[in-house]
């Protein structure tokens, strides 16, 4: 089963996300702050991470940067799911290394499409550079 780590400190947001992703067939784990998210990612080795930006202890931008800087977690796709709609937040998240950015409230079908796209891309072998 595909494991998704959700890093979300708002109980209501997590409950909705957990319920919908579980119904879609994913195994969902939760971390409630950025530091916990970084540690859980190392331990769980999830297939994908969905992360908020406004997190206690370590914000989502910094947590993303740390995950992408570590050899044991840099391969894990990260989708930022945030209420920040401004372009500067999106640009900062992409610069930190996230693979996709969605705003809340999320269109769940678009979110699942992006999850599937990132998981398929991760499973594909790298292109042969000799050709």
Predicted regions and their residues:
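Active-site beta3 strand of CheY-like receiver
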Residues: 44-50, 55
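C-terminal output helix
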Residues: 106-116
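The feature encodes the CheY-like receiver
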Residues: 56, 74, 86, 105
